[in-house]
Design a protein with these regions (language model features):
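Alpha-helical cap/lid subdomain in secreted, periplasmic
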Residues: 1-260
Length: 260
């Protein structure tokens, strides 16, 4: 391992104009209780040795480092204390299932400082007929009628993330959505917030003429996360993008596995 890694470092150092990011890979789950797949004890220790070399090289050479290993290991540890048959991995103990992959994406984006950055955010004071704040979106033509209706044009610069609730992929048994049980993904990365203060009673939210839901003035004052509503036009647009990406993946798989 040491000799091979030294050779890899030599290659990386030779590319002076390239930003190097070392990634500590996901663990081999030795502690998952599965009678059909006995673990290779000690395999994860070897993986951890490689990650230590990566971390040391990153510090020495001022390279970036992202750790997938320890956060995934910690989720497995906590959940297996409740249920020894829990794992974020597939049946081979090394490749993450969909919920594990979603957690990897979360840890990677969080390491880039994206946690807390909203999909979009709109803050309106209806009593003063004012847009108090808008983040990562355009808000125009705010109108508050004497009858209590409020309307405005809204264009977000991002789409909400459509957390998949269907298990997809070869030998995958879990869903992306399950990852939200183990990390604050929605809270940190998937917030499309509409907040309206200065209201009384209940209001029906319509977007592009579609009725979305009804909310109390109290809920609107606290803020509604539109990214959690699957029937908004923007969520449905995001789902279409997701399906296009799934088709791209299927095409790639056909090239890699022609027999499928």
């Amino acid at each position: 391992v040491d000799t091979t890694f030294q050779a890899m470092q030599k290659i990386m150092k030779s590319h002076k104009d390239t930003r190097v990011i070392m990634i500590g890979g996901t663990p081999y789950d030795e502690t998952w209780q599965n009678e059909k797949n006995k673990p290779f004890l000690g395999k994860n220790a070897t993986i951890q040795k490689i990650i230590r070399l990566q971390r040391e090289a990153a510090v020495k050479n001022d390279w970036a480092f992202v750790d997938f290993h320890n956060p995934v290991l910690e989720v497995n540890r906590v959940q297996q204390a409740k249920d020894p048959r829990f794992t974020l991995m597939q049946g081979d103990r090394i490749h993450p299932d969909n919920h594990g992959n979603m957690l990897m994406a979360y840890f990677f984006l969080k390491s880039q400082g994206l946690a807390g950055k909203p999909v979009a955010k709109v803050d309106i004071d209806a009593s003063r007929r004012m847009v108090l704040a808008n983040e990562n979106c355009f808000v125009n033509e705010l109108k508050v009628s004497d009858k209590g209706t409020i309307s405005f044009t809204y264009l977000a610069k991002s789409l909400p993330y459509p957390m998949d609730t269907i298990s997809r992929g070869w030998e995958k048994k879990h869903t992306q959505y399950e990852a939200t049980l183990y990390a604050p993904i929605m809270e940190d990365l998937n917030q499309e917030v509409l907040r309206v203060d200065g209201l009384k009673g209940s209001y029906r939210l319509e977007i592009d003429g579609d009725s979305i839901s009804t909310f109390s003035a109290e809920d609107l004052a606290k803020g509604i996360n539109l990214a959690a509503l699957t029937n908004t036009p923007q969520y449905q647009q995001a789902v279409r993008v997701m399906h296009l990406n799934e088709e791209r993946w299927n095409i790639e798989k056909r090239f890699r596995r022609p027999e499928e």
